[in-house]
């Protein structure tokens, strides 16, 4: 029986993340030197597994806090950790002695899971430039470090550009809004629209003011660019350009033609051509239906439509055909009912129980959910559901740790949905419910794992073109009458 103890709870108030990362990386470097001399599973992979578990915990909580509780002070320290981490993994991937140790392990007696892990690890060394020498090896390491910094800069620019734009409007500008929509943008005695997702979707869907829809749409799609109205200091154009050039250079160093060839090396799909064929087939299958639906919308509107018109007239057409407004659904889906239905669905599917527990966390809105079966705790989920200004947009699941020895899996589930207003509960629309089920599908994938090796437990080591299967499976239950 497993027990969730303090070591399985993330430290959401780290004192010195640079020192902490430096410490675990230095220890990892010492342990990997020992592993490079090993010749069996325990002396090689077992040692590295322990390293990965400890380093992964430090990295994941830092990355999570930077995404959901962004501040300039924390980000400054977070950026200092990126080269340390990048250099550690670059050195690990280029370690020829460790590479040879894995090849020795490959020739020992292994079970199916172990064979899979060793095979993927050997490929990982090769994609990390283990065969490169001299200046090529040095340049590869420089590229990896720079890419880690640029990736963080890109996300930071998008977040800050999103937060930089606000517009005060009159209530007349918001004709078409109901009280629920108005409450989201009411600030004191005025109304302020922003680029936060819940506000943006409401405005695109319900605002009669076409000029305002266009203004907000253009501000949203041009965030962090040189053509938008957000500050030029957040422009990601040069960041993207450098990322593309470095990815190309990195791929060529490995003997590949382009980054697409590099990317598919760790995917289920076997070639860039297969990806293009799939996308072209998807266009072929969907184009006729999309064209028909657009014509129906334009006939209904009485004029050609621009992107900022599509959600608005789709909602209007729905109301005309079905005498139904999407917002009318929301009172039937308060947050408590949605989570109760989600928990019941998961319990019926997997014979597990989900219980909300009390725990100090990085923000009072975060729900902490324990997953248990008849033998005790299985794992834990930190559910951060509401949109905030210092929080990265979108929805995702990430892991704090996987199933390993006495450690149970812990996951972060993040959304950017409506928050309670004026003492009233948060109300969700159907698409938001689908999002919640989707992200919990990822969390279940991680928590219900039976694999106890960190590099393959839960979502770890799963190709990105396969990892969406459990989450999309969970989405389907939103359409089941018994669940709704």
Q: PLM features: residue spans?
A:
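The catalytic-center signature of Zn2+-dependent metalloproteases
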Residues: 449-475, 479
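Active-site recognition of the HExxH zinc-binding catalytic motif
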Residues: 431-446, 471
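Active-site-proximal, well-structured secondary-structure segments within enzyme catalytic domains
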Residues: 113, 117, 146-149, 156, ...
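Short His/Asp/Glu-rich catalytic/ion-coordination signatures at enzyme active sites or charged loops
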Residues: 5-16, 62-81, 104-142, 192-237, ...
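Short pre-active-site segment immediately N-terminal to the catalytic Zn-binding motif
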Residues: 334, 417-437
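Catalytic Zn2+-binding segment of zinc metalloproteases
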Residues: 256-257, 441-455
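Divalent metal-coordination and catalytic microenvironments
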Residues: 17, 133, 255, 346, ...
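N-terminal helix-rich structural modules
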Residues: 2-176
